[in-house]
């Protein structure tokens, strides 16, 4: 499922402000609401959906990297939906290597790594 920011993971600031994850604490424009008054994460989730990103929507690795970490994207490109070229290259290289290793694994090794029960 990739990053759980705003979906399965949240962070709460000392004043009750709710953020998608600990890395966004203090970045008020990414606040999802407040634990005392309510919150809405739907806008954030729509924003980080990899299928809504021009750069990622046609990428072969989109379902593996899911557009990289939203906070790292924001730090590197000032846009949570835009991964840096370096991040994309690194993710693709890692997944290419992992796929290559998986293809070379025997069925027995695959069963040992991912048991069915």
Predicted regions and their residues:
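Cysteine-cluster motifs in flexible loop/terminal segments that predominantly coordinate metals
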Residues: 50-97
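Short clusters of hydrophobic/aromatic residues that line enzyme substrate/ligand-binding pockets
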Residues: 3, 32-35, 88
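A C-terminal junction/extension of Radical SAM enzymes
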Residues: 1-26, 115-117
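A broad, low-specificity signal marking well-ordered, structured residues that form hydrophobic/aromatic
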Residues: 10, 30, 86
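Short Fe-S-cluster ligation motifs
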Residues: 44, 82-117
């Amino acid at each position: 499922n990739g990053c759980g920011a705003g979906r399965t993971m949240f962070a709460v600031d000392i004043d009750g402000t709710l953020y998608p994850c600990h890395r966004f604490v203090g970045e008020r424009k990414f606040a999802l609401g407040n634990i005392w008054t309510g919150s809405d994460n739907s806008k954030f989730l729509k924003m980080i959906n990899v299928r809504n990103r021009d750069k990622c929507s046609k990428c072969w690795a989109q379902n593996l990297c899911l557009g990289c970490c939203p906070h790292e994207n924001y730090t590197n490109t000032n846009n949570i939906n835009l991964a840096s070229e370096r991040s994309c290259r690194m993710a693709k290289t890692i997944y290419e290597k992992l796929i290559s290793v998986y293809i070379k694994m025997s069925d027995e090794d695959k069963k040992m790594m991912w048991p069915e029960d």
